[in-house]
Amino acid sequence: MTRVSFFQKEDLFTGFRAEGHTGYAPAGSDIVCAGVSALLQSTVVALAELLAIPVELKAEKKTGLMICWLPAAVTGEQKEKADLLFRSAHLGLLRMAEEYPQHLEVTIKGGAEDAEAF
């Protein structure tokens, strides 16, 4: 199962942590894994290229780990724009989790200053 937790601080999404493999199908033909990867990777690319936010990123292919969080130096306006991108990914993943509940879990966690705490 893939578990995705979105970080929230002061009602704004500030990042996410995804871990695990969906197990829906063998590697290379797992549509659930492909969907999760596409949504999360698109979010990271949009943050960097559309909003010019140098996100903090940690990824490990073997474990399926991907952690993305906003650096401390982002402005209030950047945080608000990033929140919209994170919420878009969150909504897409929630819909996927409704269709594939045994393969994908999506949660929101708040309060941690450092994404590595998740």
Residues covered by each model-derived region:
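Short, conserved glycine- and acidic-residue-centered signature motifs
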Residues: 32, 36
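N-terminal intrinsically disordered, cationic/polar leader segments
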Residues: 1-31, 41, 45-118
